């Protein structure tokens, strides 16, 4: 039986579900804010945020004006954040269904996970594309530590490149390690606060998500 949002959808292609994961403080919410502001005039967007005990990221996106408040939904996961996006994604799958019932013609559903470790990944039932965000302040060694977030995500974002001189990180080393760990999978060096690298992320979403020819 078709879900309500499927029956009322007028667009031919299904909505693209983009999962955004990464450790606490890496810049996931900043990335989501910048993506929404840059893409909302071209695409029909909705966003779902995950926090363990609050809906702080939903509030931050709303206050920042990333999207109208009704297009942003906060999910309180409780417990381990990765469980709600991988082992038992039912709470997020339900949130996606609710948002698509309200906005059946959404082009993209962004799903931000709660802050987690390098082993966190999205269930393929929940996300079509995964973006994993790490930051330079976490240390030059982060890319070579591996883990599914580093090696298996569709796009790795290395954020806060502007902080490299302050923390003694060599960006060339980080880029080399990322390329070695990821093989053919792409990565982007970004300073999202200054919008540096954002166009590269948007281009990836459009190209890999088949939003453009």
Curated annotation (Swiss-Prot):
The keyword Cytoplasm applies. The keyword Nucleotide-binding applies. Transmembrane segments: none annotated. GO terms for molecular function: GTP binding; GTPase activity; nickel cation binding. It comes from the Bacteria. GO terms for cellular component: cytoplasm. It is found in: Cytoplasm. Keywords: Chaperone, Cytoplasm, GTP-binding, Nickel insertion, Nucleotide-binding. SUPFAM superfamilies: P-loop containing nucleoside triphosphate hydrolases. GTP binds at residues 22-29. One of its GO terms (biological process) is urea catabolic process. Homodimer. UreD, UreF and UreG form a complex that acts as a GTP-hydrolysis-dependent molecular chaperone, activating the urease apoprotein by helping to assemble the nickel containing metallocenter of UreC. The UreE protein probably delivers the nickel. PANTHER family: UREASE ACCESSORY PROTEIN G. This is Urease accessory protein UreG. It comes from Paraburkholderia phymatum (strain DSM 17167 / CIP 108236 / LMG 21445 / STM815). The lineage of its organism: Bacteria, Pseudomonadati, Pseudomonadota, Betaproteobacteria, Burkholderiales.
